[in-house]
Amino acid sequence: MSLEGKTVLVTGASGFVGTNLVNKLQSVDCELLTPSSSELDLTSEESVSKYFADKTPEVVLHIAGKVGGILANKTYPGEFFHKNAMMSVLVGHYAWLNGAEKVVSLAAGCGYPKHLQVPYREDQFWDGFPDENSYGYSLAKKNLIVQSWSYREQYGFDSTVLLPANLYGPHDNFDLESSHVVPALIRKFIEARDEGRDEVVVWGDGSASREFLFVDDTVEAILKMVDCNESGPFNLGTGVETSIKELIETIRSCVGYEGNIVWDTSKPNGQPRRFYDMSEFERAVGYIPSTPLSDGISKTVKWYEENRSVARI
């Protein structure tokens, strides 16, 4: 489906992925809807109902969500559950009710069971309880998948759900209390370098592994999925496993920090291992995202250093 001439709604347009997605869509001849939270409260049925009835978007790219790192998820699990559950249900329902042709949504890769053999396959997604550090967020986001399946079965409504790996890149949230691992570490190492600190303290022991996906690859995948007439969910990553220790060494190198790294083993590692089998995504779309971690980190460091005055910190 070409987006040319379509009315395209991007939820979460001012957020990390949303900002990058909107930047990409600026070159497409479509009517682009990017409402602020004051214009469209995605947790309010009254607000969502009215907005969709007034604007009748033909394509909905549902990127919005209440997101954060381990600390934020452990501190506010109820808030993470409520906001994400409401968004998950309302956006899909009112898109269908008002005649949208397609919805593409981002769910949560952390919804996979905590104890699972890697690489993760989509048919394992419901085989156990997710990691307890982010269960409120993870379980709320699973509503997107149930809704996609059930609305396709009953109404023939076309929506697709993606399970992104750990995302990073320009326009990310660099707030140390609410950010994810990559932006938090980039900020910590840059500040340590600039202030001449002898050491940087990081959580865990570095043994946990993750899969890191550059935001430009994420945007490309979302747009390609507009043409996929399947619910999924589909893993969205690179298929490459990276330990937190490797990640930190990459960030240290890109930043140019020469001090010591101190591991605070009293803090949780989170889920032990997580990376994806990307065969289903490749079957559906025909490629696998492939920006090397070192390239993506370098671009993110450069963006942050050039935009500290406007970055979310």
Residue spans of the language-model regions?
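C-terminal substrate-binding subdomain of Rossmann-fold SDR/epimerase-dehydratase oxidoreductases
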Residues: 16, 20-24, 191-313
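Flexible, glycine-rich beta-alpha linker
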Residues: 111-113, 136, 160-182, 209
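Active-site Tyr-X1-5-Lys
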Residues: 132-165, 184-194
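Conserved catalytic-site region of short-chain dehydrogenase/reductase
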Residues: 70, 105-121, 136-142, 154, ...
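NAD(P)H cofactor-binding loop motif with strongest signal on the N-terminal glycine-rich segment
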Residues: 13
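Adenosine-cofactor binding site in Rossmann-like domains, unifying the SAM/SAH pocket
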Residues: 26, 30-50
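NAD(P)H-binding glycine-rich loop region in Rossmannoid oxidoreductase-like domains
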Residues: 45-85
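Conserved Rossmann-fold NAD(P)-dependent oxidoreductase catalytic core, especially the SDR/UDP-sugar
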Residues: 89-134, 160
